[in-house]
Amino acid sequence: MKQLFSLFICCLMATMSLAQEVYTVDNLPNVHLHDATRYVCNPANILTPVATDSIDTMLYALEQQTGIETVVAVLPTIGDADCYDFAFALGNKWGVGKSKSDNGLVVLLVTDQRCIQMVTGYGLEGHLPDAICKRIQLNDMIPYLKNNQ
């Protein structure tokens, strides 16, 4: 009986260690605060370091050339939270975009919900309206992700 109980405890502990952390806007690490050249929050290492570095480099150049502030968050789960609401709240909490021009862009990928969400600040909506964001998702991002690239 004691061995069975020990086996049960071991299995329970193993199951608990495999449980994914549910990310919230409050517990998500803001990598840009620690390093101004980083724009990709990838706490579960879903993206490879090479992919993360490549995106960081592109977004740094974009900000230097245009002033557009962007953050990309790649997460395994946000629990039952809505992707749009999460992305919107993340942009507000992290202050993505200049306050005067409100030119921020948040790109959120949540693997368990199979969700890609792009949220733009009001100052960016004229250049990047929802229709163009959706087209980018459908024509570029989703096929790329389906090919595991």
Pin down the residues of each PLM region:
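Folded, non-transmembrane soluble domains that reside on the lumenal/extracytoplasmic side of membranes
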Residues: 20-149
